[in-house]
């Protein structure tokens, strides 16, 4: 069986996937130790209006979800103690959406 981990981190990756719920479920089911934690950082999300043009700007498909939709994906994957917050938020930046959940 594959090696399992206590912490898995992803930064600026999941919105490039057509269906990120599949990999989040795989991480939860197969890659995390019991009690392990998934931590994800995203700058491309609905509440970050500055990111709305990115897909067109760079010519790459990007999935646009609301923060609560990302949280729901974590919960549907079986992760517990799911939390989210906006890191490095400022007057002119919505911040990085950070979501974490525990197996």
Regions found by a protein language model. Give the residues of each.
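Core SAM-dependent methyltransferase catalytic element
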Residues: 77-79, 83-103
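Short alpha-helix
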Residues: 61-78
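Short, glycine-/aromatic-enriched active-site segment of Class I SAM-dependent methyltransferases
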Residues: 43-62
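Short conserved loop adjoining the S-adenosyl-L-methionine
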Residues: 1-3
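A conserved beta-strand element that flanks and buttresses the S-adenosyl-L-methionine
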Residues: 9
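Short catalytic micro-motifs in class I SAM-dependent methyltransferases
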Residues: 12-13
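A short, conserved alpha-helix within the catalytic core of class I
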Residues: 16-27
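Conserved beta-strand signature within the Rossmann-like core of class I S-adenosyl-L-methionine
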Residues: 35-43
């Amino acid at each position: 069986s594959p090696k399992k981990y206590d912490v898995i981190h992803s930064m600026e990756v999941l919105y490039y996937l057509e269906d990120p719920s599949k990999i989040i479920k795989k991480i939860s089911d197969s890659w995390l130790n019991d009690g392990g934690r998934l931590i994800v950082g995203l700058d491309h999300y609905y509440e970050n209006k500055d990111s709305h043009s990115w897909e067109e700007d760079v010519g790459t498909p990007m999935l646009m979800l609301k923060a609560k939709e990302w949280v729901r994906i974590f919960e549907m994957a079986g992760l517990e103690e799911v939390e989210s917050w906006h890191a490095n938020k400022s007057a002119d930046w919505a911040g990085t959406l950070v979501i974490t959940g525990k197996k």
